[in-house]
């Protein structure tokens, strides 16, 4: 059993990882500034896990709160989700993204070292591959030209953590590049609640299903894919959460930099996702085809074989379960955590 600090632990992926950590017998401390999440998730986490979870409201750029957390808790490892994640916003406000995501991660690493904590699991992204020109994506592909400051910030933090580990071999740096997390906890108590108009496909579909948006925008139907719409590697958020726990358990005591894809190895198109959600919900999702968005790729998906060999993890939940769990979340909580 380990005590894990989860930064961004009230966010979408962070909260599901907290559930998975506690289910695996670990202790958890959460740090979150609530800029993209709700305090109302905490009682729901208690309902699911039966445990009161220590919570600190604060920012990873705040050295004082980090020092207090490390002084008050014997932390063994950090799982680091905290950061901003809207691609479009990052293009409009790059300084905000580099400050939060890059500077914040550097402050966190410095304070971890000061406290003698040398194990971190970093929430990275498949966006760091850019457009390598072939699929599936494998871990030995070099980082590419990212199309947004968001993607660039993830790539920069990967480089920073890798360089820190080279200089100080006590560190275990676990860099998890994940693909497209969707779904929700099977209880229907926690799920994704984006602020404003969603940037990602499934939350957008859920908003249409809940009557909050009139129709879905499908960006491009002329890609070189079977139905002309973009294809992505979708992964159930609980599979993703379990991947974090498996990586932490397998590698946190192994010095080095460990780079792993977390994906299913299968690609689904936008129209396939719409049809799967309609089947799960019994609803019809109206949509309108619009021009392609700049920077969007036709198709990408993970090669998960290296990750399976390294940490014994692979996805367990199929597209049907992703849709059923998403629909349960949105139908039980049409206003998210404000209900």
Curated annotation (Swiss-Prot):
Pathway the protein takes part in: Carbohydrate metabolism; galactose metabolism
Keyword Phosphoprotein: no
UniProt-annotated binding residues for substrate: 125, 150, 180, 200-201, 217-219, 232, 293-296
GO cellular component, one term: cytosol
InterPro entries per UniProt: Epimerase_deHydtase, NAD(P)-bd_dom_sf, UDP_G4E
Keywords: Carbohydrate metabolism, Galactose metabolism, Isomerase, NAD
Catalysed reaction equations from the record: UDP-alpha-D-glucose = UDP-alpha-D-galactose
Subunit structure: Homodimer.
Protein name in the entry: UDP-glucose 4-epimerase
Native organism: Neisseria meningitidis serogroup B (strain ATCC BAA-335 / MC58)
Gene assigned in the entry: galE
């Amino acid at each position: 059993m380990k005590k894990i600090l989860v930064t961004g632990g009230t966010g979408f992926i962070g909260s599901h990882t907290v559930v998975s950590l506690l289910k695996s017998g670990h202790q958890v401390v959460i740090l979150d500034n609530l800029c993209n999440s709700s305090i109302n998730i905490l009682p729901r986490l208690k309902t699911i896990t039966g445990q009161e979870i220590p919570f600190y409201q604060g920012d990873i750029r705040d050295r004082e709160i980090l020092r207090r957390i490390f002084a008050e808790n014997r932390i063994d490892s950090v799982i680091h989700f905290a950061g901003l994640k809207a691609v479009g916003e990052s293009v409009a406000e790059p300084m905000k993204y580099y400050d939060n995501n890059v500077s914040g991660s550097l402050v966190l690493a410095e304070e971890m070292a000061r406290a003698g904590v040398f194990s971190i699991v970093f929430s990275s992204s498949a966006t760091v591959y850019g457009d390598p020109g072939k699929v599936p994506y494998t871990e030995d592909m070099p980082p590419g030209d990212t199309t947004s400051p968001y993607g660039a910030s993830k790539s920069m933090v990967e480089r920073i953590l890798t360089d820190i580990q080279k200089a100080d071999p006590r560190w275990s740096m676990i860099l998890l590049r994940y693909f497209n997390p969707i779904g929700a906890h099977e209880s229907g108590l926690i799920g994704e609640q984006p602020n404003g108009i969603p940037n990602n496909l499934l939350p957008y579909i859920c908003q249409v299903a809940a009557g909050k948006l009139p129709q879905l925008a499908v960006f491009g139907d002329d890609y070189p894919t079977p139905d002309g719409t973009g294809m992505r590697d979708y992964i159930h958020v609980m599979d993703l959460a379990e991947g974090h726990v498996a990586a932490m358990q397998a590698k946190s005591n192994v010095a080095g930099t460990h780079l792993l894809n977390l994906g299913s190895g299968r690609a689904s198109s936008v129209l396939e996702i719409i049809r799967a959600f309609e089947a799960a919900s019994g609803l019809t999702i109206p949509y309108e085809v619009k021009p392609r968005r700049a920077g969007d790729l036709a198709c990408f998906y993970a090669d998960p074989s290296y990750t399976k060999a390294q940490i014994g993890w692979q996805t367990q939940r199929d597209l049907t379960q992703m849709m059923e769990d998403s629909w349960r979340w949105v139908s039980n909580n049409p206003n998210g955590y404000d209900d």
